[in-house]
From Swiss-Prot:
Cellular location(s): Cytoplasm
Listed name of the protein: Ornithine carbamoyltransferase
Signal peptide: none
Binding site for carbamoyl phosphate: S57, T58, R59, T60, Q84, R108, H135, P136, C137, Q138, C269, L270, R297
Keywords of this entry: Arginine metabolism, Cytoplasm, Transferase
Chain sites annotated for binding L-ornithine: N166, D230, S234, M235
One Gene Ontology term of the molecular function aspect: amino acid binding
Single biological process term from Gene Ontology: citrulline biosynthetic process
Pathway assigned in UniProt: Amino-acid degradation; L-arginine degradation via ADI pathway; carbamoyl phosphate from L-arginine: step 2/2
EC number assigned by the record: 2.1.3.3
Gene Ontology cellular component list: cytoplasm
NCBIfam families: orni_carb_tr (TIGR00658), PRK00779.1 (NF001986)
Record's keyword annotation contains Cytoplasm: yes
Length: 316
């Protein structure tokens, strides 16, 4: 591996993108692009990553397990329901025990506070694979996808339309960090968390990014380079049928995308519900790069894993 240096990160864990600098993010993306071209780099030979899941997963589980195999290591699936933690063992005790057995933890769960405690009590790296508040690995892959398309973040406008959820939160922090212009359009009452917006705005002041929270989807996508959406019903929210009516004006369809640049690209973190948050014409059309985006989860996470594991080795 002579062409690209492993990024040096000033953190043991990745819980949100707030923990990374712009330079660290760009280094991770460039390293991820290198690993995408050189899939079988045994940089984590013999390392074990524990994968704790309290939520269903396709992309997160497969990309982390495949990534560890390609790096020469092993991903160990740990069902949250089957672990003693599911029967009352404390997060703190679980963290200390796992630190004796394995080299890193990826956790996909509900409570962000639990992930913070797990990281605090672990002597090994902890990666947030998704909580109710944040999805940093997704946002890192999204930035990689945008960077591959444009080779820059300067002057790029990303429009997020839909529910101000965990993906939206991580994209706000990501866009602020790298200096992008991000607009968010949601129905009233479904805006992103106010504290996270404040953090993004504070970061944007330092980086020159522009962050706008709107309720008008046409205004949000006006002259956008990238349009992004997510499902209207997150896991555990199924049955809130009134949301469908409220969110209908926020569907990504041929009429709405007329307001974006002609060269716009469509992004979605998947899984998608066609004819709800996006029409089939858009997600399956020529402007969509959602499967390239999904593929980049693998490469971005591999870059993150190598960087965090190597960082811990150097510190110890």
């Amino acid at each position: 591996m002579s062409t690209v240096q492993v990024p040096k990160l000033n953190t043991k864990d990745l819980l949100t993108l707030e923990e990374l600098t712009k330079e660290e993010i760009i280094s991770l993306i460039e390293f991820a692009i290198y690993l995408k071209k050189n899939k079988q780099e045994p940089l984590l030979q013999g390392k074990i990553l524990g994968l704790i899941f309290d939520k269903h997963s396709t992309r997160t589980r497969v990309s982390f397990e495949a990534g560890m195999v390609q790096l020469g290591g092993h991903g160990m699936f740990l069902s949250g329901k089957e672990m003693q933690m599911g029967r009352g063992e404390t997060v703190s005790d679980t963290a200390k025990v796992l630190s004796q057995y394995i080299d890193g933890i990826m956790i996909r769960t509900f409570s962000h506070a639990d992930v913070e405690e797990l990281a605090k009590e672990s002597s090994i790296p902890v990666i947030n694979g998704l909580t109710d508040d944040h999805h940093p690995c997704q946002a890192l892959a999204d930035l990689m996808t945008i960077y591959e398309e444009t080779n820059t973040f300067k002057g790029i406008k990303l429009a997020y339309v839909g529910d101000g959820n965990n993906v939206c939160h991580s994209l706000l922090l990501a866009s602020a960090k790298v200096g992008m212009h991000m607009t968010v359009a949601t129905p009233i009452g479904y805006e992103p968390n106010e504290e996270i917006v404040k953090k993004a705005l504070a970061i944007a002041k330092e980086t020159g990014a522009e962050i706008e929270i709107l309720h008008n989807p046409e205004l949000a996508v006006n002259e956008a380079d990238f349009i992004y959406t997510d499902v209207w019903m997150s896991m555990g929210q199924e049955g809130e049928e009134e949301k469908y009516t409220l969110f209908q004006p926020y569907q990504i369809n041929n009429e709405l995308v007329k307001h974006a640049k002609q060269t716009y690209r469509f992004l979605h973190c998947l899984p998608a519900h066609r004819e709800e948050e996006v029409t089939g014409e858009i997600i399956d059309g020529p402007k969509s790069i959602v499967f390239e985006q999904a593929g980049n989860r693998l490469h971005a996470q591999k870059a993150l894993l190598v960087s965090l594991f190597k960082n811990v080795e150097e510190l110890s």
